[in-house]
Amino acid sequence: MKASLLNKLDVLSDRFEELTALLGDAEVISDQTRFRAYSREYAEVEPVVALYQQLIRVQGDLEGAQALLKDSDPDMREMAVEEVRETKQQLVELEAQLQRMLLPKDPNDGRNVFLEIRAGTGGDEAAIFSGDLFRMYSRYAERRGWRVEILSENEGEHGGYKEVIARVEGDSVYGKLKFESGAHRVQRVPETESQGRIHTSACTVAVLPEPDEQQAIEINPADLRVDTYRSSGAGGQHVNKTDSAIRITHLPSGIVVECQEERSQHKNRARAMSWLSAKLNDQQTSAAANAIASERKLLVGSGDRSERIRTYNFPQGRVTDHRVNLTLYSLDEVLAGGVDAVIEPLLAEYQADQLAALGE
């Protein structure tokens, strides 16, 4: 293992001892904010240090086995050869595990997200495909026990959505969906196509982590224009009686968000403000992410919304992710919510990129 990584592990071991002492300190215990912060850090550091201690023990075992290779007893030497082989293999596996654990954590991975799906080129077909994508993500969320809440929707004339915005809540939502941002292309024969010709349409997907209070950008109320209107969404007669829907325009950036699904104007406003904060955060961070990805020539993780990331070919039953040259002939399963078949190879590729950078 590289000296730089061993140095990191030594630093973490020292920090682990510090945290152990701090969590037993009466002054820290009485301060719940500090106690929770140290507890979270302890939970992150402890498994790494435990694995590092195991690595050190196995290294000691290897040294002992290597010493036995010089034993005068041939049977002992034979046993030592086998032990050296097994111990070296164990060390390789432990080092690989530790390298993965040392990869930089994305602080947003555990967050809820705002999912934005918009029809692009292709007119009615693009809107119908937006509906297909929204159902795909909704079914995936259902499989993972997440909750999907539509904030705003603009339905297509022949089904689907011209635009649909949802909030997805659950464990590690952003960590799973963060590489879904980009242009999704569909190739299929529309029902109205009498000649059987394949049409190509596209939709864009954006996945924005929902910021917490610490992350939320401070927004000057003077920079906002707030409009109320009557919701066109679900909600029965009540929707027609009150102007509960909210549209907020951030004047400096021109960003517009709206929420119309809640019956309470107060709830709609709170959701819209959270979404606006996510979009402003994304605006700040995406430029930096693109620069890093470009510098390291990364295909996964750039988050470029204009990048064509995936093609769904209905006649062939094929899904192709262009970033990792992945092709699957299981379109129906993917659209039914089996998105992990595409997501897991992307996460593996991203992790490989991180490991390469860690070793530089």
Curated annotation (Swiss-Prot):
It comes from Pseudomonas savastanoi pv. phaseolicola (strain 1448A / Race 6) (Pseudomonas syringae pv. phaseolicola (strain 1448A / Race 6)). It holds the Pfam family PCRF. The modification N5-methylglutamine is found at Q237. It is found in: Cytoplasm. One of its GO terms (cellular component) is cytoplasm. It comes from the Bacteria. Methylated by PrmC. Methylation increases the termination efficiency of RF1. Belongs to the prokaryotic/mitochondrial release factor family. SUPFAM superfamilies: Release factor. This is Peptide chain release factor 1. GO terms for molecular function: translation release factor activity, codon specific. PROSITE patterns: RF_PROK_I. Its main location: cytoplasm. The keyword Ligase does not apply. NCBIfam families: prfA, PRK00591.1. Keywords: Cytoplasm, Methylation, Protein biosynthesis. Peptide chain release factor 1 directs the termination of translation in response to the peptide chain termination codons UAG and UAA. InterPro entries: PCRF, Pep_chain_release_fac_I, Pep_chain_release_fac_I_sf, Prokaryotic/Mito_RF, RF-1. SMART domains: PCRF. The keyword Protein biosynthesis applies.
